[in-house]
Regions:
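A structural boundary/capping signal
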Residues: 2, 9-18, 25-215
Length: 215
């Protein structure tokens, strides 16, 4: 039996969307295509530059931190104070779900870390010294969210421009039910990306796929 043009067109449209989703590196069409990037605008991949190199090193550091946390958890290695603190945050967060989980991690890490000048360091180093700047807070939250079970494709690091202070800043964006929530060391309030557009201009996006620049 032949199909109607409407049904054929609908299936073709679904096929095109699926192909586009695959090209974008998404895990499936359930991640809404118009909203796969926090703060909305399209982004352009960065193939080279300081941040690309930094992020490559940070991803390697996250793997090392993950192995160190696992060793502390299962192998009984000494000097695990930082890992134990991080694991407590993660386990307590797992008592919650969805927005409540990411809100817990945002608040817990904001309270555990003291504001201080900092650099790009791994999550365990952040918890070892318990201080750092927005990068340290963001890396620690990004790592904790992944360990708490949030899929990598639903996490982003976003470098933004704070319009009020005329300075660059880093936050974490976490997607829950197709809504991007912003984890920010400047506030305990968990607001959405759209609620932050008056305050922040997005500049760069960092995730498992690499570095992208907002157009």
């Amino acid at each position: 039996m032949s199909q109607s043009p409407a049904k054929t067109g609908h299936r073709l449209g679904r096929l095109v969307l699926t192909v586009v989703a695959a090209l974008l590196g998404l895990t499936g069409i359930q991640q809404s295509l118009p909203n796969h990037v926090p703060f909305g605008p399209a982004t352009l991949a960065e193939d080279h530059g300081p941040l690309v190199d930094i992020w490559k090193n940070m991803r390697e550091q996250m793997v090392a931190d993950d192995e160190a946390v696992s060793a502390c958890l299962h192998d009984g290695v000494p000097d695990c104070a930082a890992a134990e603190t991080l694991l407590h945050v993660i386990e307590d967060a797992k008592a919650h779900q969805g927005k409540a989980l990411i809100a817990y991690i945002n608040r817990a890490i904001n309270l555990l870390i003291r504001p201080a000048p900092g650099a790009w360091v791994g999550a365990l180093e952040v918890f070892t010294f318990a201080d750092g700047d927005c990068k340290a807070y963001s890396i620690a939250k990004f790592f904790a969210l992944r360990e708490a079970g949030l899929p990598a494709e639903r996490l982003r690091l976003v470098i933004v421009r704070n319009r009020r202070r005329s300075e660059d800043h880093m936050v974490v964006a976490a997607n829950v039910e197709d809504v991007w929530f912003i984890l920010d060391n400047a506030t305990m309030i968990l607001a959405t990306d759209s609620e932050n557009t008056a305050r922040y201009t997005p500049l760069l996006l960092v995730d498992e796929a690499g570095v992208r620049r907002y157009q």
